[in-house]
Amino acid sequence: MELNALIKKIESVDSYAREFLKKFEIKQEKGKFLFIAPGEDYREWLETIVNTFLEEEVRKLIEVKEKEEKKKVEIKDFLNPKYTLENFIVGEGNRLAYEVVKEALENLGSLYNPIFIYGSVGTGKTHLLQAAGNEAKKRGYRVIYSSADDFAQAMVEHLKKGTINEFRNMYKSVDLLLLDDVQFLSGKERTQIEFFHIFNTLYLLEKQIILASDRHPQKLDGVSDRLVSRFEGGILVEIELDNKTRFKIIKEKLKEFNLELRKEVIDYLLENTKNVREIEGKIKLIKLKGFEGLERKERKERDKLMQIVEFVANYYAVKVEDILSDKRNKRTSEARKIAMYLCRKVCSASLIEIARAFKRKDHTTVIHAIRSVEEEKKKDRKFKHLVGFLEKQAFDKIC
């Protein structure tokens, strides 16, 4: 039987059949006609006609099915509700980033895409990304937030389980993708390939992408040129923490921890913190030990670091002030990097605390010094024994 003849038979039962059948997908398979209904009502309508009014020989030619809906992809958004646009403290150094994100939320995917926010540690990048996610979620959008490192780990797990398509579909089904700590894509080639394809899919679908990193895309060593090019294809916004904004944050954080807004405490925090993480860390210590207790603890820690410097200066027969200066002769340079290394290993001081003790603007010099010592220890057995000896001596004498 031809399809037209079959449709005429159905029309003879119901005059509206031709219009209704336009909603069906009709396939011919193995001598049968498969009618795929768009929903339950249409399926029941056609089944009633077929089973009640058509002859047995015609019924055998017809199969009716309901269209299978694609399973909705379940999304774990990894958002923390404590981060909102309302409690993000705006100042001169972060105003542009804040305004760009707010505007993008009004026109997801069509105004600024991608948005790449960069700035040093503890300047509020994560807060802003999370706040954007929470705001978009509140408006009914599908959102996912992840750090680059978590993205890589999840991808590896899905590859092991054989569920990589589930992973891809989850990321490709969102309206807003927030990727934090983009610098951790560095050197992860397989992860970069996966993210590149997800990025392209979302971009072509005009879905919003917001990225954050501790450095400009051009400084992302170990990240492919084609990804860097995508990152630079939207809007780049630097985020900083100026003194006025830090002052506002300190006051808000003190209120948050129910601490008195004493001038000496605020002045101390302004003098001894550079970013939000440091502010929160110090305030937690003030809450725990009291302001005077914190001052005593930090004075003790600073004294230990200076004792390490003096110990190394004596061993190398150089001046303490030379170690703390920018002098670059071989003896002083070696003493300086070993002193930094011992401050980290013996006193467990933070990179920022060591940088401050050695009068450095940031902690990159400290990182370089520690890595240099560790690399030289691997190559030179004599140097390794020397560092081990100094470490033991420093620990016994100072800690």
Swiss-Prot record:
Can you tell me which residues bind ADP?
89, 94, 122-127
In this chain, Mg(2+) is annotated as bound at 126, 181
* Outcome when changing residue 190 to D: 8-fold decreased affinity for ssDNA, very poor unwinding of 15-mer dsDNA
List the subcellular locations: Cytoplasm
Stretches the record annotates as Domain III, AAA+ region:
78-290
Which SUPFAM superfamilies does the entry link to?
P-loop containing nucleoside triphosphate hydrolases, TrpR-like
Q: Where is this region: Domain IV, binds dsDNA?
A: 291-399
For this record, the Gene Ontology CC terms, alphabetical, are:
cytoplasm; plasma membrane
* This protein's UniProt keywords: ATP-binding, Cytoplasm, DNA replication, DNA-binding, Lipid-binding, Nucleotide-binding
> According to the UniProt record, where is the region Domain I, interacts with DnaA modulators?
1-64
Segments of this protein annotated with the region Domain II: 64-77
Q: Where does ATP bind?
A: 89, 122, 124-127, 180, 277
| One BP term from GO | DNA replication
Check the record and name the InterPro entries matching this protein.
AAA+_ATPase (IPR003593), Chromosome_initiator_DnaA (IPR001957), Chromosome_initiator_DnaA-like (IPR020591), Chromosome_initiator_DnaA_CS (IPR018312), DnaA_C (IPR013159), DnaA_dom (IPR013317), P-loop_NTPase (IPR027417), Trp_repressor/repl_initiator (IPR010921)
Q: Name one GO molecular function term.
A: lipid binding
Domain of life, source organism: Bacteria
Subunit structure, interactors included: In the presence of ATP analog AMP-PCP forms a linear, right-handed spiral filament with 4 subunits arranged head-to-tail, about 122 Angstroms wide and about 360 Angstroms long. Mg(2+)-AMP-PCP binds at the subunit interface with the gamma phosphate coordinated by adjacent subunits. dsDNA probably wraps on the outside of the filament. ssDNA binds to the center of the helical filament via the AAA+ domain, which stretches the DNA.
Task of the protein: Plays an essential role in the initiation and regulation of chromosomal replication. ATP-DnaA binds to the origin of replication (oriC) to initiate formation of the DNA replication initiation complex once per cell cycle. Binds the DnaA box (a 9 base pair repeat at the origin) and separates the double-stranded (ds)DNA. Forms a right-handed helical filament on oriC DNA; dsDNA binds to the exterior of the filament while single-stranded (ss)DNA is stabiized in the filament's interior. Able to melt short unstable dsDNA (15-mer with melting temperature, TM, 43 degrees Celsius) in the presence of a non-hydrolyzable ATP analog; a more stable dsDNA (20-mer, TM 55 degrees Celsius) is poor substrate. ADP does not support dsDNA melting. Addition of DnaA-AMP-PCP (an ATP analog, beta,gamma-methyleneadenosine 5'-triphosphate) to an oric-containing plasmid causes a DNA shift to more positively supercoiled topological species, stabilizing a positive wrap and right-handed filament as seen in the crystal structure without DNA.
Report the domain remarks: Domain I is involved in oligomerization and binding regulators, domain II is flexibile and of varying length in different bacteria, domain III forms the AAA+ region, while domain IV binds dsDNA. An ATP-specific conformational change within the AAA+ domain accommodates and stabilizes subunit-subunit interactions necessary to support oligomer formation. ADP-binding does not allow oligomerization. Probably binds dsDNA via flexible domain IV.
Q: Which family does it belong to?
A: Belongs to the DnaA family.
User: What's this protein's name?
Assistant: Chromosomal replication initiator protein DnaA
- What organism is this sequence from? Aquifex aeolicus (strain VF5)
Name of the gene encoding the protein in the UniProt record: dnaA
